[in-house]
Amino acid sequence: MEFEFIRNTLMGEYYVKCSMGHEIVGRWLQEEIGKDPTMIAQVEALIDKAFSLPSQEHTLTGTEISLMIQGDEVLVQENALSHDYDVEMESEFDFYDAESTASCGIEDFVALIEQWKDFLNI
């Protein structure tokens, strides 16, 4: 997973750009976690928990996007995708679903979080 951090010094805003197929990870980091040191600490605690109990699923439910870690796999997914919908409509939403969920290895995810902290000077 490739990513880039952008700082708008005039507006004091921070942005995350992730590679194709991982855009939702950038949205999650930017919108759900942002510059909040408490939220970043919660993510780090979840990662530590996942390393110590790899067979369990560890979840951080966000307002719109949630994080799930199990073993060495990280899944970021829009909360709307966890709702059931009609099977006939399933094919119509395939493209939307592809942009609304992404997975990566835990090592890549840890690197993303550490570099985000460094970028924000937290």
From Swiss-Prot:
Belongs to the UPF0231 family. InterPro entries: UPF0231. This is UPF0231 protein VP2494. Pfam families: UPF0231.
